[in-house]
Swiss-Prot record:
Species this chain originates from: Salmonella typhimurium (strain LT2 / SGSC1412 / ATCC 700720)
Pfam families named in the record: GDP_Man_Dehyd
Active site: D134, E135, Y167
Protein family membership: Belongs to the NAD(P)-dependent epimerase/dehydratase family. dTDP-glucose dehydratase subfamily.
Protein name: dTDP-glucose 4,6-dehydratase
Reaction equations catalysed: dTDP-alpha-D-glucose = dTDP-4-dehydro-6-deoxy-alpha-D-glucose + H2O
Length: 361
């Protein structure tokens, strides 16, 4: 099987590419614009494979994407290319509209025209797999807001959309486009919505890598508000395995939620990281002493949590990592890969971190 992957140099995309090349016989065509979060070093251990191909291109460039489709003749598309950081979407939403909405439209149109011209067998087996987020659903009741006896709800595949940030609104828009292209044109699409990912090769603007690296550098560990926001954490390699299972075994027209069964308050996540660092690289005082509280994000969702029962029942997928095992692997990876970290932390990234976090104190 030949799979065209957009955004394959990003955090989740590179995990998918590594998984496919290392664990299957499928061929990958990786399309990536290589924006700040795209890093080919994340693919260095598979880049010489004769089943791996890289194309430096923008999904908004329809002519170039058409050329790539015609050259490689993919059997499936896995669409991961996206702007994905909520804070960046608040200060600069235009890039999110362009990539996540306009880019998805452009890719859908190229894929639709390509699919329409395929022979019957290849046409029937083709899949356009759109990878999305649980943030499109908005947020869920927080334990602080309900009585102890009440069972807290989870996001399911039929939860109504209620995005609350420019990022989640742009992803919700792209989800709707994908489903419309199936209903209107018959394009065999699948949508997956995932919870918060973590693991190796994560760009250090996100909570877990930011805390690990700031802790090691003796910098403040910024916590939004009281740190009581709850997220479900999914180890990225578990997610990659699920995504490949969906594109190869999932049913066209379906939606699958993918979660890690690990609801944690942000502050507890930071405590766990600090305690691991105290154990692995101890210093005179606990890393917890570096925690600092900053002004909360505007419109910050209080709780996300996914019901991943459907993908478990229908495809047999379950996460292999607990949060405790996955976060230990993640911390150990960052300790062992300082060169990768140094290479991605450019001057532009440092300026953004200073503006976004230090300006909130």
């Amino acid at each position: 099987m030949k799979i065209l992957i957009t955004g394959g140099a990003g955090f989740i995309g590179s995990a998918v590419v590594r998984h496919i090349i290392k664990n299957t016989q499928d061929t990958v065509v990786n399309i990536d614009k290589l924006t700040y979060a795209g890093n080919l070093e994340s693919l260095s251990d598979i880049s010489e494979s004769n089943r791996y191909n890289f194309e430096h291109a923008d999904i908004c460039d329809s002519a170039e994407i058409t050329r790539i489709f015609e050259q490689y003749q993919p059997d499936a598309v896995m669409h991961l290319a996206a702007e994905s950081h909520v804070d960046r979407s608040i200060t600069g939403p235009a890039a999110f509209i362009e990539t996540n909405i306009v880019g998805t439209y452009a890719l859908l149109e190229v894929a639709r025209k390509y699919w329409s011209a395929l022979g019957e067998d290849k046409k029937n087996n083709f899949r356009f797999h759109h990878i999305s987020t649980d943030e499109v659903y908005g947020d869920l009741p927080h334990p602080d807001e309900v009585e102890n006896s009440v069972t807290l709800p989870l996001f399911t595949e039929t939860t109504a959309y209620a995005p609350s940030s420019p990022y989640s609104a742009s992803k919700a828009s792209s989800d709707h486009l994908v489903r419309a292209w199936r209903r209107t044109y018959g394009l065999p699409t699948i949508v997956t919505n995932c919870s918060n990912n973590y693991g190796p090769y994560h760009f250090p603007e996100k909570l877990i890598p930011l805390v690990i690296l700031n802790a090691l550098e003796g910098k403040p560990l910024p916590i939004y508000g009281k740190g009581d926001q709850i997220r479900d954490w999914l180890y990225v390699e578990d997610h990659a395995r699920a995504l490949h299972m969906v594109v190869t075994e999932g049913k066209a027209g379906e939606t699958y939620n993918i979660g890690g069964h690990n609801e944690k308050k942000n502050l507890d996540v930071v405590f766990t990281i600090c305690d691991l660092l105290d154990e692995i690289v101890p210093k005179a005082t606990s890393y917890r002493e570096q925690i600092t509280y900053v002004a909360d994000r505007p419109g910050h969702d209080r709780r996300y949590a996914i019901d991943a029962g459907k993908i478990s029942r229908e495809l047999g997928w379950k996460p292999l990592e607990t949060f405790e095992s996955g976060i230990r692997k993640t911390v150990e990876w960052y300790l062992a890969n300082t060169q990768w970290v140094n290479n991605v932390k450019s001057g532009a990234y440092q300026s953004w971190i200073e503006q976004n976090y230090e300006g909130r104190q």
